[in-house]
């Protein structure tokens, strides 16, 4: 059984797209999927509210949600994906600035890991 993980960003539109894709991929693979919400102690109230909305969306779509603290998003994602035995990790790479900037995506992609990474852009789907 395959395990799909998705890192939920602060951007609501991107988070929704990633949830839809993670749920669909897990269903096609007859597997489970989990959503990771990376927080830190200084998370302002509006960002915390967004994180909760994204988590609720993930749960409504059949995902399990992990809220985790971590200042280094890439390292935290790598550790969580390994711990949860993720086979495929989905990350967003939109043009807009958000917490999972290209630097984070590049660091995860280049890291030594035991899972595949799928990077989803915010452009139109082909």
Feature roles, as predicted:
Residues 61-88, 125-126:
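Structural beta-alpha unit
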Residues 26, 58, 81, 110-112:
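A generic structural signal for well-ordered alpha-helical segments
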Residues 10, 82, 94-96:
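Short glycine-rich anion-binding loops that position phosphate/pyrophosphate groups of nucleotides
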Residues 109-126:
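Short, flexible loop segments at boundaries between secondary-structure elements
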Residues 92-107:
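Glycine-rich, Arg-bearing micro-motifs that act as flexible, cationic patches
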Residues 37, 88, 93-94, 121:
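Short secondary-structure boundary segments
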């Amino acid at each position: 059984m395959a395990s799909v993980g998705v890192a939920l960003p602060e951007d609501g539109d991107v988070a929704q797209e990633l949830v839809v894709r993670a749920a669909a991929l897990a269903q096609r693979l007859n597997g489970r999927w989990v959503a990771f919400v990376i927080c830190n102690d200084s998370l302002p109230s509006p960002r915390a509210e967004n994180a909760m909305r994204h988590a609720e969306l993930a749960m409504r779509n059949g995902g399990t949600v992990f809220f985790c603290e971590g200042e280094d998003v890439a390292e935290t994602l790598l550790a969580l994906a390994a711990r949860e035995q993720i086979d495929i990790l989905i990350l967003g790479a939109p043009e807009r600035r958000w917490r999972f900037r290209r630097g984070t995506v590049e660091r995860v992609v280049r890291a030594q890991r035991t899972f595949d990474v799928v990077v989803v852009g915010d452009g139109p789907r082909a």
